[in-house]
Structures are given as C-alpha cells and as structure tokens.
Amino acid sequence: MSLEGKQYYFVAYDYDTSAIFAIPITDLRDETIIIAFTEVFEELVEKGYTPTFNVTDNQATTPIKAFLKKKNCHWKFVEPSNHRVNAAERAIQTFNNHFISGFSSTDTNWLLQLWDQLTRQAVTTLNILRKLRMDPLQISIRTAEWTQI
C-alpha cells in the first residue's frame, strides 16, 4: 500500500494511439473503477482521440455500460479468462514490465510506499517509446501532446 492509500493500478489501452494509461487506485469497487475509466476517457477526448468502441473484461460492467451509453460508444465485454481477445491484457504486461524496471532503478534507501509517485514518469516514458497506429505525420504532434500529460 502506498502512503496515499493506493493499492492497485487501473491500466487501460487505446488501440488507435497505442497509448497505455495507468492510474493508481485505492480499491476495486465499481465506483473507483468508473472514476479511473472516466479519467482515461476524458484524457483521450481532450487530446482529440474520442473512443468509439471499447473492449473490456467483466469488471464493473453495469457502470461502464451506462457511461459508454452516455458517450455514444459501443462496447464488447469478454470473459475474464479469455486474455487473447482483450488487447489490454498485453498492455498490462507491458506496463508492469516497464514500471518494475524503472522501480528497480530507484535508490536503495527510497521508500517503497512512494511507488504511486512514479506513475506519471512511467506512463510518459512508456508512451513515448510506443509506435502510433495512425497517420505517421502526426507522430511529432502526438509526442508533444502526450509528453504534456
């Protein structure tokens, strides 16, 4: 547990931008997940990439359905054991590997309870390294936008 009470990461993946999002959360209640989900959705809209389709596992299905319906976004829910269909599963692995490698390079005297303070740096460096699936001419624009997160 972090000093701010965070215990988990909410990790999301956007296919078009190939961006991975990670938000430290306190618990796995529906309300907490929908707040993190909304934060990711709003950030994508703010950057000009409005999601139109969402694939997710069955966690917090009712609130996510209601949210996506309000945003005119289609959705598909996959069973939790089917990791091949959900591209976010690979994004979770990628984020975990990147975060752990960065975490292991911290000072040996650094407080482990501050792990959630590394999130912004980890997400920024991870997304700068990823390739864009959209128009290659937008790469420099995307890099400038995502580094301002």
Residue ranges and their predicted role:
Residues 1-97, 132-149:
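Retroviral integrase
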Residues 94-106:
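A polyampholytic, Gly/Pro-enriched intrinsically disordered region
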Residues 104-149:
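Charged, gly/pro-enriched flexible loop segments at helix/strand junctions
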